[in-house]
Amino acid sequence: MSAGSTPKPSPLVEGIFRREILPWGLLGLTLGLVEGATAAILVKQHFAGAASSFGVNIAVALVSGAPAFSNVLSFVWANVAHGRARVQLMVALQAAFALLVGCVALASRASAGLAVTVLSIIAARVVWAGILTVRAAVWTANYPRHVLARITGRIVIVNAIAVATSAALVGGALQGRVIDARWLYGGGAIAGLSGAWLYRAMRVRREFQLLAAEAAHGGKSEPFSLRMLTQILKEDPAYREYMLWMGVFGAGNLMLTAQLVLLFSEQLHLTSGVQIGLLAVVPLLTQPLFMPAWSRLFDGSHVVRYRSRQGWALVLASLTLCLGVFTRSLTLLWLGAVLLGAAQAGANLGWNLGHNDFASLGRAQHYMGVHVTLTGLRGGVAPPLGVLAYMGLERWHAGSGEWALLLPLAMTVAGALGFNRMRVALER
């Protein structure tokens, strides 16, 4: 290999990748039905008039934040997975996830059906949080660090395309009203169960070493818990600061999505198809175009340096979307959707893999547990606060709710500045 050339994955690594690409693609079809923006638009459009406006808006906030909020119980999943064979556990979680998504198809169009829908989506996302926690350890074991982002980036690309496909189908069903959009959730359950069945062929490299390393760090005698979470943050000041700025940065992003769903529906009066196109389909389809560039940047630097660059991409996307709302410009909104996809491609990569630059062997799952648990806390708080800020301004003066967008924009800027502060300290 010549100096400066990019190392290629070994045939063994490529073989492992081929085994898991199709299962994750099928599960992506299921996941797309409970992604934050898609689920929020479904709730807003399908249950409008079937429940109180306040109840529907709070439900929008809950399902919008569900992908993040559900992670608050990740320490339980880290404890369940610690010291256990990963593939069998993963298959069980994937099957449970698919069945919970299918429950949405059974919900009636009434207040009770709204409750069933919200609870099913949150429960499905709780199980998906377990899948992400276990998958982090599998990927770390199977793929060397110098190719980790490129290999997993391919999986994320396939997953994003599948999620976008599901989102587009929901948007078409809501707008065309040819079929009930909830029927798609039954099909999503079948796709997810098929993915779980295929994942049984997956293997974990040197799993005995992984289990031994976990046992050396306490094994079942020291399960992951809130006490361990606080201990890790106390003992690792660099990771603690990284989590602080991730919290500010991520909360702004989560708050923005919930507010945009309400603004698009209540003030801009966009159709369901356009809303899902702006908040789900276009960002998801844009991600694969930018993933290779973000992957190369991640593989060649520490996550702090990476975030100090990637953070500004999300700031630019958020600013463009806000300007699109303020000026009622569809052109700016579509541009913002493209920029959002570009930024999310990098954000997803850093979210899934960034903790590895702080954790030692055998502790990656615990560090990921800290990360996703804190993600859950902001997911449960930020979207409802954003929605309440919007409704409060609307109650004070009709039409002024759009100014609530300044809150998530300011938080995203603050987070990006925090990552740059860490980068400067790291390079001293």
Residue ranges of model-derived segments:
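Helix-loop boundary and gating motifs at the non-cytosolic
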Residues: 2-72, 238-280
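Juxtamembrane intracellular "pre-TM" segments in multi-pass secondary transporters
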Residues: 2-17, 206-244
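Intracellular juxtamembrane helix-capping segments at the cytosolic ends
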Residues: 130-143, 346-360
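C-terminal ends and interior cores of transmembrane alpha-helices
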Residues: 95-112, 313-328
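Cytoplasmic membrane-interface "Motif A"-like loop-to-helix N-cap segments
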Residues: 82-95, 299-314
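Multi-pass alpha-helical transporter architecture, strongest
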Residues: 10, 23, 105-108, 191-203, ...
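Helix-to-loop junctions at the C-terminal end of transmembrane segments
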Residues: 72-86, 174, 289-303, 390
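A membrane-interface helix-boundary motif in multi-pass transporters
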Residues: 172-190, 390-412
